């Protein structure tokens, strides 16, 4: 295993981190995951890739993503989502429902990543990707009108 691979294998215990710290990590993991997915499926100009990635990573898109996966979550995962939704970081934007849901999703992603539950994380993110494909078609259709 390379040093780079070892870098992501961590002895950090997610349960000992604040929920906002989990969201901080989750934001990076989620964004990187969909940036790479976008590169694989949209081998076009960077501007197009950026706009496509925004469908996934903006707060509104993350709220939709959370709605897609909520019914598949375990009780443990639901607790993390609930904590993320109610976190101090989520409340910074006042009553912005999109931002609260985005923070909740990021907390879950960060938690699963730091727990090393990569298969579970991929399973959930693939559900998001499959659902967002329909948003992408709508966005492309709307941009042509």
Curated annotation (Swiss-Prot):
It is found in: Cytoplasm. Its cofactor is Mg(2+). It is an enzyme of class 3 (hydrolase). GO terms for molecular function: ribonuclease III activity; rRNA binding. It comes from the Bacteria. Its EC number is 3.1.26.-. One of its GO terms (biological process) is rRNA processing. The keyword ATP-binding does not apply. SUPFAM superfamilies: RNase III domain-like. InterPro entries: Mini3_fam, RNase_III_dom, RNase_III_sf. Keywords: Cytoplasm, Endonuclease, Hydrolase, Magnesium, Nuclease, Ribosome biogenesis, RNA-binding, rRNA processing, rRNA-binding. One of its GO terms (cellular component) is cytoplasm. The active site is at residue 27. Signal peptide: none annotated. Homodimer. Belongs to the MrnC RNase family. This is Mini-ribonuclease 3. It comes from Kosmotoga olearia (strain ATCC BAA-1733 / DSM 21960 / TBF 19.5.1). The gene is mrnC.
